[in-house]
């Protein structure tokens, strides 16, 4: 079966679709709506994707799905859409709970939004915490219509599709976690599901669907036990479903997070996959769920171990330089970021992946043999950690 | 006369692209060592422009021009290329001297590079100074050959040009100056000159040339007298 090469909506982040900002207040009666945002830029895609304007909400709805997709959780016929939404909402909750537990005080700020025709999302950001410089965990559920050309571009398929707009559904969780301590690593993960409906003039045409996602790890300093721990958890999740997954998705990750102009990777990899649909749908839903559930055990023990280590200004400066590489990758190459910026998504949700600060030092080269050099070498020549 | 709309080589700091080799300057040349060679990514322009690999140099040459472009300083007919190079070298020196005077102590670090077939440049960077967080002042002189498509893209001309690779010359100075104090503004400037030679299979075809450049001002806070001063000059 030919693999999908969806460039539209195959991005690691769905942040572009959660564009309205809403300040969360512990006391709902003191809540005030933010000033309306000035008009978004016109969509400038080669093919335009049609999405309604979002509306802020004061409370989290039980589901962002349209009524026709919403089946009670107890029903054995609950749709993949509904179960995927449940999964990403649960992942958001469990990751945020784990982060707040480590923080010991600071809480996430939450923005909730929805769209009249269905869909919406929740953005949570914790900034300037005790442990985290910046942590963002976003979920979004999007309904839209794309013209046939966008569908062909998204799917990379031959033009055997019937002409007519193609309704689509996309949902995902996306997160970047930047700790303060230079010895604690940055984590990124996202898991997403994409589905097309039959065009209105061709009822009964088969649906297309695929999964995408990944989890990757960006330390400034290598603690081999930490990298091995992280990669072992990814491999365990993969091996439960297919032993070819880890080697395949590990390589895909190393290739995706390549900073071409530097000839180095953003970090030390993890797993990454896109356009997966050549397996049983139930199996892939379980796989994505397993991967999302692996984020906390893969990452939190490492942060707990490193968050209070003593560090010097030199360590902090090196972390800042590596955060500069993170920025370079995200702004120049990351499909999620570039897609969001081009389609008029919510800028704050898109760029929440960037750290609070970063550094670009002219012609900086770590001295060979130092810990900084070891990290750079591992980003230039990806390793097999397990 | 139609204005040039060169998309290639028109970017404000595009000349840095051509001075990509790293070179640490050392106050004592005898302790100087060349850095381990860095693997460089392939050029990935929409149309490929052919440029030789650069070589680090320990001293500034009097000129980066090819001998045939001559540095006849005494001749009243010496070329626009030569005079433009002289101008940008002078601009680099004056700006760096003024910056160092404000700094009182920290000096620019200099990298000099050249290419065997002619061309080269000087990058100067002052980082973590007393006044400047980061100040860069670069000059470069480039000889290369571009395919006709790149030339049409650079010049946005109609396709009346003869097919065949087109030799070009480009020179420029480019600088960005970021002060430490949030009330002191960032400055960017660049001035560049671009010229094409006649293709080898069409000797005598007319040269094309154009200038580009600008100076712009990016404060974090507005002091109206400062902005007026800048725009008045």
Curated annotation (Swiss-Prot), chain A:
Homodimer. Key enzyme in heme biosynthesis. Catalyzes the oxidative decarboxylation of propionic acid side chains of rings A and B of coproporphyrinogen III. Substrate binds at residues 174, 190-192, 344-349. Its main location: plastid. Disruption phenotype: Spontaneous formation of necrotic leaf lesions. Pathway: Porphyrin-containing compound metabolism; protoporphyrin-IX biosynthesis; protoporphyrinogen-IX from coproporphyrinogen-III (O2 route): step 1/1; Porphyrin-containing compound metabolism; chlorophyll biosynthesis. It is found in: Plastid, Chloroplast; Plastid. The active site is at residue 188. Keywords: Chlorophyll biosynthesis, Chloroplast, Heme biosynthesis, Oxidoreductase, Plastid, Porphyrin biosynthesis, Transit peptide. Its EC number is 1.3.3.3. It comes from the Eukaryota. Expressed in cotyledons, leaves and roots. It comes from Arabidopsis thaliana. One of its GO terms (molecular function) is protein homodimerization activity. Residues 125-134, 326-361 are annotated as: Important for dimerization. PROSITE patterns: COPROGEN_OXIDASE. This is Coproporphyrinogen-III oxidase 1, chloroplastic. The record marks 261 as: Important for dimerization. GO terms for biological process: chlorophyll biosynthetic process; protoporphyrinogen IX biosynthetic process. SUPFAM superfamilies: Coproporphyrinogen III oxidase. Belongs to the aerobic coproporphyrinogen-III oxidase family.
Swiss-Prot record, chain B:
The keyword Oxidoreductase applies. Residues 1-48 form a transit peptide. Pathway: Porphyrin-containing compound metabolism; protoporphyrin-IX biosynthesis; protoporphyrinogen-IX from coproporphyrinogen-III (O2 route): step 1/1; Porphyrin-containing compound metabolism; chlorophyll biosynthesis. Gene3D superfamilies: Coproporphyrinogen III oxidase, aerobic (3.40.1500.10). Pfam families: Coprogen_oxidas. One of its GO terms (cellular component) is chloroplast stroma. Its EC number is 1.3.3.3. Its main location: plastid. GO terms for biological process: chlorophyll biosynthetic process; protoporphyrinogen IX biosynthetic process. The active site is at 188 (proton donor). Transmembrane segments: none annotated. It comes from the Eukaryota. SUPFAM superfamilies: Coproporphyrinogen III oxidase. Belongs to the aerobic coproporphyrinogen-III oxidase family. This is Coproporphyrinogen-III oxidase 2, chloroplastic. It comes from Arabidopsis thaliana. The gene is CPX2.
